[in-house]
Every structure is written in structure tokens, then in C-alpha cells.
UniProtKB/Swiss-Prot annotation:
InterPro entries from the UniProt entry: Adenyl_kin_sub (IPR006259), Adenylat/UMP-CMP_kin (IPR000850), Adenylat_kinase_CS (IPR033690), P-loop_NTPase (IPR027417)
Name of this chain's protein: Adenylate kinase
Oligomeric form and interacting partners: Monomer.
Main location group: cytoplasm
Gene name as annotated: adk
Domain notes: Consists of three domains, a large central CORE domain and two small peripheral domains, NMPbind and LID, which undergo movements during catalysis. The LID domain closes over the site of phosphoryl transfer upon ATP binding. Assembling and dissambling the active center during each catalytic cycle provides an effective means to prevent ATP hydrolysis.
Protein's organism: Streptococcus pyogenes serotype M49 (strain NZ131)
Organism placement in taxonomy: Bacteria, Bacillati, Bacillota, Bacilli, Lactobacillales
Keyword Oxidoreductase listed: no
Length: 212
């Protein structure tokens, strides 16, 4: 089974990806892991990626696409299938993935889209606070400290609501064309992500069993 998992930051995509890998035995291919492995193994694309990263530059799409292609060509993919997590990030990468899969004789079986209302995600992502003395991390709503005093805690710039909202807006603008592309191919299953983790996975599992 060859899959993509898609979701906005905070939607719980990583948690569900780990559960899919555990339950269905597919190879988990995340962008970060791919880059680290390619650079550690000094593959052609890994060396290219490192040259950009060392200069503090963004890795261009053709290198990222090349690293994905190297990984999808490995033997375990044909045996186990894959779950791509964090790629494609743009419609151009989605088209490149289509071409790579065709070249390698692989087929995408499904796209799992973990849907959560953006306003809920702002609450999830902007609630993180850090204790000034201990460095411990809490959440205002989901994991509040016992003796909360506002002056004892601070919030990182990245976690402030306006910053979180901007980040989500960028992700939605990039993600919509990708979802539309896969919807036209009849591959997308929408999963309601604003429920208990076990309930989300029950819906994911049901969808994937129907694909088998």
C-alpha cells in the first residue's frame, strides 16, 4: 500500500503516521529523515542537499525531488509500500512525485487528509507556555501548570496566535492545490481530526482497510 498523509501543522498528522506505520507495516518516509539519511550515506542528492544547507540556502525542488526518488527506489518500498509524510509541499512537487512513481512503476493508492478547523489549530498551537525558571513546557488549555502565575511564564514568538495564523495561512495556500490535484484523481479520504486520537485512527484504519 502506497500512501500520502496530509494535514496542517497541529492536526496530529505525525501521531497518525506513526500509528499507520505500526498497524500496516509500511515504510515511513518523512522529509527530515530522508534528508538526514541521504546526507549521512553521501548519496549524490544527499551531497547536493548538504552543499545548500551548509551555505544556509533553501534546498531547491529538484534536489528534494531527487532525494525522494532515491528513497522510493530502495528495495524495502517494493516489499512493504510507503507512507509519505511532509512531501509533496507544493503542487510542483506533487507533479514531480507523479512522474517519479510512474518511472519507478509504483502507484499511489490513497491520500489521507487529516482535517481540523484552522481556529482549533490556532488554539492548539498558540497555547504553549514555558516556565521561565525550569524551562518546562505547558499548554494553557490542554496541560496547564498547577500554580499558574502569568509572570512566571513566557511564550515563544513562534507560538503567538498571530504568528501561528500566518503559518497556517501559508500552509493552506500551498496545500489546497495539492489536495485538489489528488481529489481529481479520486485518491483523497478526509478524516475528521478534531476528536480523540484513538477515534481519529479508527477512521483512518477503516479508510485504509477499504483500500486494501
Amino acid at each position: 500500500m502506497n500512501l500520502l498523509i496530509i494535514g496542517l501543522p497541529g492536526a496530529g498528522k505525525g501521531t497518525q503516521a506513526a500509528k499507520i506505520v505500526e498497524e500496516f507495516g509500511v515504510a515511513h518516509i518523512s522529509t527530515g529523515d530522508m534528508f538526514r539519511a541521504a546526507m549521512a550515506n553521501q548519496t549524490e542528492m544527499g551531497r547536493l542537499a548538504k552543499s545548500y544547507i551548509d551555505k544556509g540556502e533553501l534546498v531547491p525542488d529538484e534536489v528534494t525531488n531527487g532525494i525522494v526518488k532515491e528513497r522510493l527506489a530502495e528495495d524495502d518500498i517494493a516489499e512493504k509500500g510507503f507512507l509519505l509524510d511532509g512531501y509533496p509541499r507544493t503542487i510542483e512537487q506533487a507533479h514531480a512525485l507523479d512522474a517519479t512513481l510512474e518511472e519507478l512503476g509504483l502507484r499511489l493508492d490513497g491520500v489521507i487528509n487529516i482535517k481540523v478547523d484552522p481556529s482549533c489549530l490556532v488554539e492548539r498551537l498558540s497555547g504553549r507556555i514555558i516556565n521561565r525558571k525550569t524551562g518546562e513546557t505547558f499548554h494553557k488549555v490542554f496541560n496547564p501548570p498547577v500554580d499558574y502565575k502569568e509572570e512566571d511564564y513566557y511564550q515563544r514568538e513562534d507560538d503567538k496566535p498571530e504568528t501561528v495564523k500566518r503559518r497556517l495561512d501559508v500552509n493552506m495556500a500551498q496545500g489546497e492545490p495539492i489536495l485538489e490535484h489528488y481529489r481529481k484523481l479520486g485518491l483523497v479520504t478526509d478524516i475528521e481530526g478534531n476528536q480523540e486520537i484513538t477515534d481519529v485512527f479508527a477512521d483512518v484504519e477503516k479508510a485504509l482497510l477499504e483500500l486494501k
